[in-house]
Amino acid sequence: MKFISVLALGATATSVLGASIPVDTQVEKFLIELAPGETRWVTEEEKWELKQNGQDFFDITDQDVGFTAAVAQPAVAYPTSIRHADAVNAMIATLSKENMQRDLTKLSSFHNRYYKSDYGKQSATWLQQQVQAAITASGANRYGAKVASFQHNFVQHSIIATIPGRSAEIVVVGAHQDSINGRSPMTGRAPGADDNGSGSVTILEALRGVLQDQTIVQGKAANTIEFHWYAGEEAGLLGSQAIFANYKQAGKKVKGMLNQDMTGYIKGMLDKGLKESFGIITDNVNASLTTFVRMVIKTYCQIPTIDTRCGYACSDHASANRNGFPSAMVAESPIDLLDPHLHTDTDTIDYLSFDHMIQHAKLIVGFVTELAK
């Protein structure tokens, strides 16, 4: 998760079709999209300079020729009332702050989780093992639930956990797993406890909660459920772009995607005299799905919401949106009050509230169950 940028873009942006390949072939270049149709070729170093200045982007270097970003999404009817309160409340009762603290302590202990580093590969492997353990412990694997790697052209892989339902329509919850030290991406210490270890372990604990429901475990939910952990988000939403482009090409149907990017920091709100709240992202999301998310929060969570905007390509929900799938995003706070330690070696567990992270986990359990069951 990053702040909306007011950075003035020095180079002239061009359309994707008009973006010529850079002449200098000695330095690797990447094609990035800073706004719809506005692209530029940059070096890896220039990528991180943009990030340090708060400018988000899609890295579209490997985008298929002929790809067209979705300008509209198919209409989806979302529930307008709560239907599974007893089941959701039973699952919520099993959520554990202790589990999240244990998992985040381990996940943030990797030197970094940079998408090109061995640490990024090791952390993804460890995370996938925890997902597999949750599935196996629930017995859902006996009914077709599974976890799989989604490989990329860099060493860190994305992770997809699938709990089959009666239909192939998919309800997705996602979070990016990588971290970055903005000053030294490859070798710098980047615990990434909040950005985005918090989101990664929050959805992991929510998965454990969802797997307490035998209807879901036994594949009897109306829709299929997927939990995603994306690789390479910091480098331009690489993992989520690849997955949702693959889904688009395969003709998969996604009923809704909820993104969790930074779920643990509340000090910024409290210091401003605000109540602890969710930050509801209102730009580059599906309005109807966001309305549904508000209903889930009001029913199952104990904190209010504040509307906020995060800008173009700010996190992985934008990849779903760009490929024509309805998405929503809920952050730990309004964007201007996010954790100031992100992308540094001080993004540690010490600054986080696990009570707040439990609120996010409750949201996820409610979202998945009300939409899939």
UniProtKB/Swiss-Prot annotation:
Cofactor: Zn(2+)
Keywords tagged on the record: Aminopeptidase, Disulfide bond, Glycoprotein, Hydrolase, Metal-binding, Protease, Secreted, Signal, Virulence, Zinc
UniProt-recorded Gene Ontology molecular function terms: aminopeptidase activity; metal ion binding; metalloexopeptidase activity
Endpoints of the signal sequence: 1-18
One Pfam entry name: Peptidase_M28
Disulfide topology: 310-314
Positions with a binding annotation for Zn(2+) 2: 195, 234, 343
Family annotation (InterPro entries): M28_fam, Peptidase_M28
Glycan attachment sites: 196, 286
Positions with a binding annotation for Zn(2+) 1: 176, 195, 261
Subcellular locations according to the entry: Secreted
GO (cellular component) term, any one: extracellular region
Keyword Metal-binding: yes
EC number, UniProt record: 3.4.11.-
Chief site of localization: secreted
Cofactor binding comment, as recorded: Binds 2 Zn(2+) ions per subunit.
GO biological process, one term: proteolysis
Subunit details: Monomer.
Protein task: Extracellular aminopeptidase which contributes to pathogenicity.
Membership in a protein family: Belongs to the peptidase M28 family. M28E subfamily.
Protein name: Leucine aminopeptidase 1
Organism in which the protein naturally occurs: Arthroderma otae (strain ATCC MYA-4605 / CBS 113480)
Lineage summary: Eukaryota, Fungi, Dikarya, Ascomycota, Pezizomycotina
